[in-house]
């Protein structure tokens, strides 16, 4: 066992990495996989097996067998997607004869004369519903769509029964008969109180759709954001075990000192994603209300907690992740498990980083009164880079590990870099959060509430696309300039170019998922609800990311102590990886099915 441990540690050490563009090419498989799901979703059952075969298995194949030709594999998946998208357009967009709804404006071919007044109310019941003029439609809409029909200002019956007297007698017997009396108003039942009322005739009356705004799930969740985070989790889960097999290319494993690889960007992406969804919880608290009387200012009791109390609250929330870190530490040290010390240190692991980064973000939050999250992240990264260049870098690359700080020098020294990534993720999250905010309640006469929300969402989505394009170009330009000036990327140090690379990578692929949901043909999006745009398996992994990540770590350890992974043939390696990924998928699936969220 001792010889195998040394061989295994040598197996995962000394990796020079690969080019950034080859890593982007491998990651394109994730976008192609999501496009495949969108194309196939109208034709399949959304059970666990189909979710796994479409959402997980292509990713596994993309980072292992097809990692040497990722563009070919992504193109193959894209061709299948385009075929089914074209098929869906023919299936759902067949021509239909236009059907004129009842109670709408008259066409030019219809008569402009008012309907004849029936002799009696009894006779009117047998008459077929009459077509209405524009003024009559506006009158009917105002009376039927009122939230309280008993107080309609234009309804004679409501006035007589309202309890108010009519001293002038204008609402009594001598009133002018309404042209709508005796006419059967067959107004469609779908018009309800959600339609906005206007004192002027509406230009058009549209059916109020019962479905949610396309592209927005319940509780403001966004499909593209859910899929992005779930795919990031999936690729991390796959790689942490696949790296132990020969079928996983060495250049995709973590680099030793400097370099770029798929697993290097995956670590930073995990932190970036955590910041992306922490925007609400880390937004600056609103200022306490100030009394209108200046005399009361001296008696104000501050209701806003102090920064220290916020830090303690955040630390308390991080306790479960810290506990997981200590559990992993005990298991690794107690089982003589092969470990790569230069990743984080002797005792440090990634759970400690995940637990401490949000606490540090709360500590620097008061600075957001003057600086944006992204600017603050860049400043911290540049200051960290200065410390690395002139003091810390020689110490980190040395062999000395005496004392608790030197033993875990990689973990401690990389915290400012991961904090910068987290803050940049918060900045992008601010922009994404605006997409789920409801529109202002404005007076609209030509569209329903649902249509108004849909148009608002589309405008905000286009704004977000343009913002992400700008941020992506900016981060890539910053990274390119730094590398051109001679800088090198180092995950071990979490230096400034590594921060810029993680920001550029994640902003670009978040933009890719958003574009996929934006360019979906209307024929598919009309038949595919927002809940179907997010595969159930990916939604389950997104909701229970911590449980899925913990299960993946436990299963990875179980596989490594059960077999000599580095000597396994390709067919056995792929079989184990498929069973492993299916087992992890089942964990998230079962938790979601039982409505358990960890």
UniProtKB/Swiss-Prot annotation:
The chain crosses the membrane at residues 20-40, 43-63, 65-85, 223-243, 258-278, 307-327, 344-364, 377-397, 464-484, 500-520, 571-591. It is a multi-pass membrane protein. GO terms for biological process: GPI anchor biosynthetic process; protein localization to plasma membrane. One of its GO terms (molecular function) is glucosaminyl-phosphatidylinositol O-acyltransferase activity. Pfam families: GWT1. Pathway: Glycolipid biosynthesis; glycosylphosphatidylinositol-anchor biosynthesis. InterPro entries: PIGW/GWT1 (IPR009447). Keywords: Acyltransferase, Endoplasmic reticulum, Glycoprotein, GPI-anchor biosynthesis, Membrane, Transferase, Transmembrane, Transmembrane helix. Residues 95-121, 149-172 are annotated as: Disordered. Its EC number is 2.3.-.-. Residues 107-116 have a biased composition (Acidic residues). It comes from the Eukaryota. Signal peptide: none annotated. Glycans are attached at residue 560. GO terms for cellular component: endoplasmic reticulum membrane. Residues 152-162 have a biased composition (Low complexity). It is an enzyme of class 2 (transferase). It is found in: Endoplasmic reticulum membrane. Belongs to the PIGW family. Probable acetyltransferase, which acetylates the inositol ring of phosphatidylinositol during biosynthesis of GPI-anchor. This is GPI-anchored wall transfer protein 1.
């Amino acid at each position: 066992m001792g010889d195998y441990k040394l061989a295994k540690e040598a197996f995962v050490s000394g990796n020079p990495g690969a080019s950034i563009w080859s890593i982007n090419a491998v990651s394109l498989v994730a976008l192609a996989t999501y496009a495949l799901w969108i194309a196939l979703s109208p034709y399949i059952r959304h059970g666990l097996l189909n979710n796994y075969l479409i959402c997980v298995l292509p990713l596994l194949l993309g980072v292992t067998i097809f990692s040497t030709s990722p563009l070919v594999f992504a193109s193959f998946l894209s061709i299948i997607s385009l075929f089914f998208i074209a098929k869906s357009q023919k299936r759902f967009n067949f021509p239909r004869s236009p059907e004129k709804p009842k109670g709408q404006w008259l066409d030019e071919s219809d008569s402009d004369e008012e309907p004849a007044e029936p002799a009696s109310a009894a006779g009117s019941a047998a008459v077929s519903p009459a077509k209405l003029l524009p003024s009559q439609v506006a009158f009917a809409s105002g009376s039927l769509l009122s939230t309280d029909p008993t107080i309609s200002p234009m309804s004679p019956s409501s006035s007589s029964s309202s309890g108010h007297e009519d001293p002038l007698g204008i609402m009594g017997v001598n009133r002018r008969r309404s042209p709508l009396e005796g006419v059967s108003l067959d107004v469609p039942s779908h018009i309800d109180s959600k339609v906005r009322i206007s004192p002027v005739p509406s230009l058009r009356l549209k059916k109020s759709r019962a479905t949610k705004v396309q592209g927005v799930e319940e509780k403001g969740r966004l499909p593209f954001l859910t899929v992005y985070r779930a795919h990031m989790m999936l690729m991390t889960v796959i790689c942490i075990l696949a790296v132990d097999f020969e079928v996983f290319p060495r250049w995709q494993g973590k680099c030793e000192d400097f370099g770029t690889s798929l697993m290097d960007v995956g670590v930073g992406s995990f932190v970036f994603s955590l910041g992306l969804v922490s925007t609400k919880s880390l937004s600056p608290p609103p200022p306490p209300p100030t009394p209108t009387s200046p005399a009361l200012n001296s008696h104000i009791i501050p209701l806003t907690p102090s920064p220290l109390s916020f830090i303690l609250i955040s630390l308390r929330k991080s306790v479960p992740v810290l506990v997981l870190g200590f559990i992993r530490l005990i298991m690794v040290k107690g089982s003589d498990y092969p470990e790569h010390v230069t990743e984080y240190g002797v005792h440090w692991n990634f759970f400690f980083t995940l637990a401490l980064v949000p606490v540090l973000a709360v500590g620097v939050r008061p600075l957001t009164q003057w600086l944006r999250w992204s600017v603050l992240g860049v400043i911290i990264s540049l200051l960290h880079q200065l410390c690395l260049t002139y003091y810390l870098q020689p110490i980190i690359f040395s062999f000395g590990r005496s004392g608790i700080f030197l033993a875990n020098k990689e973990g401690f020294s990389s915290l400012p870099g991961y904090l910068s990534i987290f803050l940049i993720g918060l900045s992008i999250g601010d922009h994404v959060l605006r997409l789920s905010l409801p529109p202002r309640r404005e007076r609209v006469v030509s569209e329903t509430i649902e249509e108004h929300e849909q148009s608002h969402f589309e405008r905000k989505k286009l704004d977000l696309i343009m913002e992400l394009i700008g941020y992506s170009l900016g981060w890539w330009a910053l990274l390119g300039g730094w590398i051109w000036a001679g800088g090198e990327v180092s995950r071990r140090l979490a230096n400034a170019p590594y921060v810029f690379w993680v920001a550029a990578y994640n902003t670009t692929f978040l933009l890719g998922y958003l574009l996929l949901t934006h360019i979906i043909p209307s024929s598919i999006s009309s038949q595919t609800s927002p809940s179907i745009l997010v595969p159930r398996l990916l939604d389950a992994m997104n909701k229970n990311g911590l449980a899925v990540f913990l299960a993946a770590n436990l299963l990875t350890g179980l596989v490594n102590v059960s077999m000599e992974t580095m000597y396994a043939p390709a067919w056995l390696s792929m079989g184990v990886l498929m069973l492993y990924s299916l087992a992890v998928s089942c964990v998230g699936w079962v938790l979601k099915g039982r409505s358990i969220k960890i």
